[in-house]
Amino acid sequence: MKLHELKPAEGSRKVRNRVGRGIGSGNGKTAGKGHKGQNARSGGGVRLGFEGGQTPLFRRLPKRGFTNINRKEFAIVNLSTLNRFEDGTEVTPELLLETGVISKLNDGVKVLASGAVEKKLTVKAHKFSSSAKEAIEAAGGSVEVI
């Protein structure tokens, strides 16, 4: 390969389409805007959601629900994920963060019962589902709510 043989990547050097520059270009005269009307004008076009005067969809549908400003977002950990730790390990939210099981703590860690745990672990978390608590204790481990 030599310097004079280098070519830009396919499609990376697209030529700008200059509209309104003669009929031979295929985009002359009306520049692809058609004849007259709101969309042909400078600054023309309708606002987002406008349906030509018909009551727009977002106004036809009823309002529903609300956003709870006190909502707590827990980092979810399933039992199947806990099997990666050695027998007898104390599993804490900090350890879960370090090992990359969870990306951030949010409002705490909640352990759910998806999968099965085969190791004896001491699990410390902010919340447990009742079935997850039973499964950990059945495997000989212990549960501690922080």
UniProtKB/Swiss-Prot annotation:
Q: Name one GO biological process term.
A: translation
One cellular component term (GO) for this entry is: cytosolic large ribosomal subunit
The keyword DNA-binding is assigned to this record: no
User: Could you tell me the keywords of this UniProt record?
Assistant: Ribonucleoprotein, Ribosomal protein, RNA-binding, rRNA-binding
**Please, which domain of life does this record's source organism belong to?**
Bacteria
Entry annotated with the keyword Ribonucleoprotein:
yes
Region annotation Disordered: residue ranges?
1-52
Where is there biased composition of kind Basic and acidic residues? Answer: 1-13
InterPro entries reported for this sequence: Ribosomal_uL15 (IPR030878), Ribosomal_uL15/eL18 (IPR021131), Ribosomal_uL15/eL18_sf (IPR036227), Ribosomal_uL15_bac-type (IPR005749), Ribosomal_uL15_CS (IPR001196)
- Residue ranges annotated as compositionally biased, kind Gly residues, are 21-31, 42-52
What terms describe the molecular function in GO for this protein?
rRNA binding; structural constituent of ribosome
List, alphabetically, the HAMAP family matched.
Answer: Ribosomal_uL15
The record's NCBIfam families line, in alphabetical order, gives: rplO_bact
UniProt similarity note: Belongs to the universal ribosomal protein uL15 family.
Q: What's this chain's function?
A: Binds to the 23S rRNA.
Question: What is said about its interaction partners and assembly?
Answer: Part of the 50S ribosomal subunit.
For this entry, the protein name equals: Large ribosomal subunit protein uL15
- Gene name linked to the record: rplO
